Amino acid sequence: MHLQRNFFILIFFFISFLLWKTWQQKEFSSDVHKIINKYENVNLVNNNINKLASNIIIKTDVLKIQVNLYGGDIEKAELLHFKSKLNSSQSLVLLDTNENFVYQAQCGITGKDGADNLQKHIRPLYIAKRKYYELSRHNKKIEVPLQWISKDGIIYKKIFVLKSGEYDVSVKYKINNITNKHLKVSMFGQLKQTINLPEDKNTYTNNFALQTFRGAAYSSDNDKYVKYSFDSIVNKEKKNIVVTHSGWVAMLQKYFATSWIPDNSYLNTMYIGSSGDNLAEIGYYSRPIDIFPHSTISLSSKLWIGPEIQNKMAVIASNLDLTVDYGWLWFLSQPLFKLLNFLYNICGNWGVSIILITFIIKGITFPLTKSQFKTMAKIRKLQPKINYIKKKFKNNNQKISEEIMSLYKTEKVNPLGGCFPLFIQMPIFLALYYMLISSVELRHAPFFLWIHDLSDQDPFYVLPILMGVTMFFIQRVTPSNVTDPVQKKIMNYIPILFTVFFLWFPSGLVLYYLISNLVTIIQQKIIIKALNKTLK
């Protein structure tokens, strides 16, 4: 009885969690649509300024970026190895600039004698030798120099360096002070993005799937990873958040990120906030840097534009790999992903890797499963005595509970022992869920036949239905201590309820649960057979 009650409590919390997430997403979606309508007629791009300048294109084998010569900002970035949608011929556009949506990576030289003044909308108008640059197959990197000369004759060179197969962009500055003046400048980098997405970029789905984090984040000397949702930034004035040598600022979304990594040779101030035209901003500026008369200095920073590939991001900057947001169960999701990635390197298929990791998890938890069935068998053996206690004290529920607990203590039976494995599986299940919906490696990753994307739902619902069948079979062959007909009826509906929920879950997660159920059936037969021999 206690075992079944604990099981129902577990099911209650699981269903409550899913319903809460769904309600939260519906509220979020409603708010988003309201704010989108408010801003839909706002022109987010200053067309008068942009008409004065032209753009240049820089292309490698993995990146294609568009740089506006007015300021030298990156206004568009395509990830050539990632498609916008499954089976689409169009590359994914991460950074973009149009009338309804802005997502830019800005950088420059500001300060008392700098070329850039964002507050007054003053930017240098750079010149380039040509409009299109492409990395050849025989070269490992490409350098694209831009140049601007101030009215005082100070020469500013802004150089973009892109490498073959890499998503980090180096931005270098060479400032030649030919004057007799002592200059003070600061280097800055900023990311800005439309807070509320227009309809064509809103990936919200109205089902039970959990939504991943979208917002801004930073890392510093003292904090490895701090994040801000866009909801917490909207209508907030810019404020300095930390002064640090090391670290980065970033904007995050599902599977992809952009991040400025400043030069840690200088002390940098990081800031965050929003402007009045529906834009969130996060960035940094360095402490004032001296440029003496008739001298040249070199400055640099790095920009990550691409997928959240953890091992590559960790090389670019310390803690940058933490932008892969696994939620509150990150301490389980991270080792699970490392194990899954290790298995993938062996077998070359993410679906097979999920099957293998299921075998490993079920093998590790087998002692708990065995303990669960032992506890259930002991409780069934005590059922006649429990029924006698209920009959003897039928008008005194408190006495019944006391006598049953006394019986468990005498017989050395822990009624919670049968439910413990269920509680162990829940965090593993959720950790695997967050891993599957947050790891870019599984985006559009095929398994076999009709499963072309393990991070998305099964298009034909075959896996959820099979999972429901295995769950129903487990329920039928598992010896039960339930005697109440109402509870029995409710138990019969549990597989159906779970099948409905799993229809919209990532197919990789449903595959895990299906294989887990199949392994459970085999383990169950082995354990029950051994217990029957022991209890004879």
Curated annotation (Swiss-Prot):
Keywords: Cell membrane, Chaperone, Membrane, Protein transport, Transmembrane, Transmembrane helix, Transport. Signal peptide: none annotated. Its main location: membrane. The keyword 4Fe-4S does not apply. The keyword Kinase does not apply. Gene3D superfamilies: 2.70.98.90. The chain crosses the membrane at residues 3-23, 346-366, 417-437, 454-474, 494-514. Pfam families: 60KD_IMP (PF02096), YidC_periplas (PF14849). GO terms for cellular component: plasma membrane. It comes from the Bacteria. It is a multi-pass membrane protein. It is found in: Cell membrane. GO terms for molecular function: membrane insertase activity. PANTHER family: CYTOCHROME C OXIDASE ASSEMBLY PROTEIN COX18, MITOCHONDRIAL, OXA1. Belongs to the OXA1/ALB3/YidC family. Type 1 subfamily. Required for the insertion and/or proper folding and/or complex formation of integral membrane proteins into the membrane. Involved in integration of membrane proteins that insert both dependently and independently of the Sec translocase complex, as well as at least some lipoproteins. Aids folding of multispanning membrane proteins. Interacts with the Sec translocase complex via SecD. Specifically interacts with transmembrane segments of nascent integral membrane proteins during membrane integration. This is Membrane protein insertase YidC. The gene is yidC.
